[in-house]
UniProtKB/Swiss-Prot annotation:
The gene is argC. The lineage of its organism: Bacteria, Pseudomonadati, Pseudomonadota, Betaproteobacteria, Burkholderiales. NCBIfam families: argC_other. GO terms for cellular component: cytoplasm. This is N-acetyl-gamma-glutamyl-phosphate reductase. GO terms for molecular function: N-acetyl-gamma-glutamyl-phosphate reductase activity; NAD binding. The active site is at C117. Signal peptide: none annotated. Keywords: Amino-acid biosynthesis, Arginine biosynthesis, Cytoplasm, NADP, Oxidoreductase. Pathway: Amino-acid biosynthesis; L-arginine biosynthesis; N(2)-acetyl-L-ornithine from L-glutamate: step 3/4. HAMAP family: ArgC_type2. It comes from Burkholderia cenocepacia (strain HI2424). It holds the Pfam family Semialdhyde_dhC_1.
Length: 313
């Protein structure tokens, strides 16, 4: 019996290493790997890209575009973990739970672009509410998120874990101060927003895990929309989702904090709705592993869908 062959182009980066770890002991796929001395040789990479059934690209954006250009075999399918193709119309966006039937679309796609880590939480919260008409498309969305330092890639991990004093000097590092983070167009397009969201990301002095929050003013929503209706919409949308759950309102009322590391090592996404009815305010939240549902876990979930595993979504 032959098994599908998977080639991870860029398997020594943060995401590539995680995907390799998730696949190496599986018996239903065969990993195609290159010797260390050949990993950066264009000709050898091109050979591997054309010899596999599914290529997973864990590369910087320019290198990912180059890798796609190397592929001449029309049978090769691609999952791109970079941000190079996330807003391209000829690529399927790899967030299975974001819409009815989307997992089926991924399962039959030739080209799948893995979502960014922050967009996973933002789109997961916003898209169902926008689709239901509970949140206007022109709502002035503000997104605040804190990720573990692994969100900065291999260089950030090496800096923090080597004891680099400068890297570890601040417990929290807010960045993207030009308000032009590369995830903004992705969030706007796939959430369905009419305008650019305001996005402020930060890195914390811990390895992995994200807490993302979006404040909502109920007075800016259509008449009759309450925090409870926002929660009910999300709960209904994700009722059958294997990897997304919505915190019950009672649990949200009892919560005193959100732990960004709570879902580390999983491919799960936990959404929350915190309501101050008297103040007319709601806080939407998403907690997940930036290396799990925000990267490698999502890639493997998409791979499983492309291989025909119905349980993956």
């Amino acid at each position: 019996m032959s098994f599908p062959t998977v080639f991870i182009d860029g398997d020594q980066g943060t995401t590539g290493l995680q995907i390799h770890a998730r696949l190496r002991d599986r018996t239903d796929v065969r990993l195609l790997t290159l010797p260390a001395a050949e990993r950066k040789e264009a000709a050898r990479r091109a050979d591997a890209l054309n010899a596999c059934d599914i290529a997973i690209l864990c590369l910087p954006d320019a290198a990912a575009r180059e890798a796609v250009g190397f592929i001449r075999n029309p049978a090769v399918r691609v999952i791109d973990a970079s941000s190079a193709h996330r807003t391209q119309p000829d690529w399927v966006y790899g967030f299975p739970e974001m819409a009815d039937g989307h997992a089926h679309e991924i399962a039959h796609a030739k080209r799948v672009t893995n979502p960014g880590c922050y967009p996973t939480g933002a789109i997961g919260l916003l898209r169902p509410l926008l689709q239901a008409g509970l949140l206007p498309r022109d709502y002035p969305v503000s997104i605040h998120a804190v990720s573990g330092y692994s969100g900065g890639g291999r260089a950030a991990v090496d800096a923090f874990e080597s004891g680099d004093a400068a890297a570890r000097a601040l417990p929290l590092q807010v960045y993207g101060l030009a308000l032009a983070h590369k995830h903004v167009p992705e969030i706007r397009q796939h959430a369905g927003l009419a305008h650019r969201p305001f996005f402020v990301p930060a890195y914390g002095a811990y390895r992995q895990g994200i807490v993302l929050t979006i404040p909502i003013e109920l007075r800016l929503l259509p008449a009759g929309v309450t925090g409870e209706r926002l929660h009910a919409c999300l709960a209904h949308h994700y009722a059958d989702a294997r990897h997304v759950d919505v915190m019950p309102l009672a649990d949200a009322r009892a919560a005193t904090h959100l732990d960004p590391q709570a879902l580390n090592g999983t491919n799960d996404l936990r959404l929350g709705v915190f309501v101050n009815a008297n103040g007319g305010q709601v806080l939407l939240s998403a907690v997940f592993d930036n290396l799990g549902k925000g990267a490698s876990g999502a890639a493997v979930q998409n791979l499983d869908l492309m291989l025909g595993a119905r349980h993956a979504a």
